[in-house]
UniProtKB/Swiss-Prot annotation:
UniProt KW keywords: Secreted
Pfam families referenced in this protein's UniProt entry, alphabetically: T6SS_HCP (PF05638)
SUPFAM superfamilies assigned to the protein according to its UniProt record, in alphabetical order: Hcp1-like (SSF141452)
Name this polypeptide is given: Protein hcp1
GO CC annotation: extracellular region
Keyword hit for Secreted: yes
Taxonomic lineage from the root: Bacteria, Pseudomonadati, Pseudomonadota, Gammaproteobacteria, Pseudomonadales
Top-level taxonomic group: Bacteria
Note, other: ATP hydrolysis by the first AAA domain of ClpV1 is required for Hcp1 secretion.
Function in brief: Required for assembly of the protein secretion apparatus HSI-I. Actively secreted during chronic infection of cystic fibrosis patients.
InterPro entries linked to this entry: Hcp1-lik_sf, HSI-I_assembly_Hcp1, T6SS_Hcp
Assembly behavior: Hexamer. Three hcp1 monomers form two closely related hexameric rings with a 40 Angstrom internal diameter.
Coiled-coil regions listed in the entry: none
Length: 162
């Protein structure tokens, strides 16, 4: 399944030409996760620890957002919000089925590189954040929405549900 992916980070402008996501950053790939430090290997109860939330990482083409992201990483600038949006590509009724909203965002790394055989240079960017909200929209076989979104939210700083 082909998908369209975009990220909007504060006032940083990208080069997306998409009608709905104009001037956002086109995302080629992304990853994010979390782990729990609890242990079920010994003792009688098996306790849970504090969740370890990873930085969100994404790959993009080098574009006009690049110098701004580099400056934000260098200076430690914080953005109030970043939003990663993913939808199925093509068709008339494109449903944005996964939206990840980050709050209190810091650009934690920018890694640029390439080789002579590539058409366009790419870079990897990682974002650190204090709070996350995930909205997943189930879809029917025909692509229509199937009910409302399923949500997850966590305040990382306070280690509580958001």
């Amino acid at each position: 399944m082909a998908v369209d992916m975009f990220i909007k980070i504060g006032d940083v402008k990208g080069e997306s030409k998409d009608k709905t996501h104009a001037e956002e950053i086109d995302v080629l790939a992304w990853s994010w996760g979390m782990s729990q430090s609890g242990s079920m290997h010994m003792g009688g109860g098996g306790g849970a620890g504090k969740v370890n939330v990873q930085d969100l990482s994404f790959t993009k083409y080098i574009d006009k957002s690049t110098p701004n992201l580099m400056m934000a990483c260098s200076s430690g600038k914080h953005y109030p919000q970043a939003k990663l949006t993913i939808r199925k590509a093509g068709g008339e009724n494109q449903v944005e089925y996964l939206i990840i909203t980050l709050k209190e965002v810091l650009v934690s790394s920018v890694s640029t590189g390439g080789s002579g055989g590539e058409d366009r240079l790419t870079e990897n960017v990682t974002l650190n954040f204090a709070q996350v909200q995930v909205d997943y929209q189930p879809q029917k076989a025909d692509g229509a929405k199937d009910g409302g979104p399923v949500k997850y939210g966590w305040n990382i700083r306070q280690n509580v549900q958001a």
